[in-house]
From Swiss-Prot:
It comes from Talaromyces stipitatus (strain ATCC 10500 / CBS 375.48 / QM 6759 / NRRL 1006) (Penicillium stipitatum). This is Arginine biosynthesis bifunctional protein ArgJ, mitochondrial. The alpha and beta chains are autoproteolytically processed from a single precursor protein within the mitochondrion. It catalyses: N(2)-acetyl-L-ornithine + L-glutamate = N-acetyl-L-glutamate + L-ornithine; L-glutamate + acetyl-CoA = N-acetyl-L-glutamate + CoA + H(+). The record marks 160-161 as: Involved in the stabilization of negative charge on the oxyanion by the formation of the oxyanion hole. Belongs to the ArgJ family.
Length: 470
């Protein structure tokens, strides 16, 4: 038995926000004290309450990592009252940022145990900064350990922002004790922390939920997560950071497999612009504060928690796509009836990062030929996966009306352009590519499915990224 109660988008927020932008709108920050709101289309994604895990406290504090930021929070601290088991997934970019290297080393040294905090700064990536950058990242972690009264390494560190610049490390170290003294387990504290890790994001991304596990049906566990990212998103991984926290007890040996599976079907299945960053990190911490039996890889609880964590990570990662720089559409691409999952995933990824597909969607043009072209040139696809005369393409409207068939078994349909245009007016769209089982279709085989989430390309994306550093 497994019960889920999710607290996610709950309509207009109780508190107010202001979006402060630079000359051309690329830096978006938040001030909860101002009597304004975030943009109407984004407001629905901000939770007005949450159910947060026991034993975790968080804070968002202003440092001024970027000189132009004179009052907005840009230092996030997540801390557990008790040591956690932990795991993390990192960028595959060869130029791994200093905080990535330090966090990897800490997890290796501690063997996924004894992790107590995560410290994150926005405004500077501390990437490609040499030995000095490594020392800066280590000093951030060590300062938090000092606040915790711990001599062994127990803090993971993350950074996000412009590559190739050193951190104003003295300013950050001076404010870490303030961040520590501000730790709390309230909704406003979690929201402020989620805001503190934002860069070009238009809204903070935070969700939480409760769940139960088969071995302890009488215990209600909580899971909370925050993430940031709006550009340079095409995992494995992209410019996104994320922290997932639960008060369920999870054995250290189970943490990495749980996270890897969840990330493969969520954060590694999204794309905004096809670029892979130097800093990506998704960390998962479990402190066991709610009690119960530890989840191990051989227990029934493992399967139950895997379902919870994967679904949760999908919901969180989709907020990144919805906040894609300049995005006007949230697109789901579903590859059905493939002979193998990995080939389906590669095809979905190719469609998701195609500039021609993305610009056609922005222009509300039902140019299915661009989708089919991407299917045909997808790299690394197993022979016999794509058989042209078995391939079909459709648009699935969000209103529940019948799908609009564009291509059926390799034959083009007469498309109702008026209906196609109406479907493309909506913010949400699903593209279905049915491979008909590929070469295995005649045998009734080939039922694998892969899903990717992505957004369109607009004029604003070029504006934001053409002026990022100014």
């Amino acid at each position: 038995m497994m019960i889920l109660t999710k607290t996610g988008p709950l309509g207009p927020v109780t508190n107010s926000f202001i979006i402060a932008t630079t000359r051309r709108g690329q830096i978006r920050l938040y001030n909860i004290l101002q009597d304004t709101t975030i943009p109407e289309p984004k407001r629905k994604h901000i939770p007005s309450s949450g159910t947060y895990p026991k034993g975790f406290r968080v804070s968002g504090t202003h440092v001024g990592v970027k000189a132009a930021n004179t009052k907005y929070p840009d230092l996030a601290l997540i801390s557990s009252d008790e040591p956690c088991t932990a795991a993390a997934v990192f960028t595959t970019n060869k130029f791994q940022a200093a905080p990535v290297q330090i966090s990897k080393l800490t997890l290796d040294q501690r063997k996924g145990k004894g992790i107590q905090s995560v410290v994150i700064n926005s405004g500077c990536a501390n990437a490609v900064t040499g030995k000095g950058g490594l020392e800066d990242a280590q000093s951030m972690a060590s300062k938090v350990d000092e606040c915790n009264g711990i001599s062994e390494p127990s803090t993971l560190v993350m950074s996000t922002g412009v590559i190739g610049q050193r951190l104003p490390i003295s300013k950050i170290l001076d404010k870490i004790p303030t961040a520590y003294s501000n730790l709390a387990n309230t909704h406003n504290a979690w929201l402020a922390t989620a805001r503190a890790i934002c860069t070009t994001d238009t809204f903070p991304k935070l969700i939480s939920q409760t769940f139960t596990l088969p071995s302890s049906p009488g215990i209600t566990y909580s899971l909370a997560g925050m993430t940031k990212g709006a550009g340079m998103i095409h995992p494995n991984m992209a410019t996104l950071l994320g922290v997932l926290c639960t008060d369920a007890p999870v054995d250290a040996s189970a943490m990495k497999p749980l996270l890897l599976q969840a990330v493969s079907r969520s954060f590694n299945s999204i794309s905004i612009d096809g670029d892979t960053s130097t800093n990506d990190t998704i960390a998962f911490l479990a402190n066991g504060a709610a009690g119960g039996q530890p989840v191990t890889s051989s227990s029934a609880d493992y399967t139950a928690l895997q379902k919870v964590l994967t679904s949760f990570a999908q919901s969180l990662s989709q907020l990144v796509v919805r906040d894609g720089e300049g995005a006007t559409k949230f697109v789901t691409v579903r590859i059905q009836n493939s002979p193998c999952y990995e080939s389906a995933r590669r095809i979905a990824s190719t469609i998701a990062r195609s500039p021609l597909v993305k610009t056609a969607l922005y222009g509300r043009d039902a140019n299915w030929g661009r989708i089919l072209c991407a299917v045909g040139y997808a790299d690394g696809v197993t022979e016999g996966t794509v058989i042209p005369e078995r391939t079909s393409v459709s648009f699935k409207p969000v209103d529940g009306s019948p799908v609009l068939r564009l291509l059926v078994n390799g034959e083009p349909e007469v498309v109702d352009e008026e209906r196609a245009s109406a479907i493309l007016q909506d913010e949400d769209l699903e593209i279905i590519v049915d491979l008909g089982g590929g070469s295995k279709g005649e045998k009734g085989l080939g039922g694998e499915e892969a899903v990717y989430w992505f957004c369109d390309f607009s004029h604003e994306y070029v504006t934001i990224n053409g002026d990022y550093r100014t």
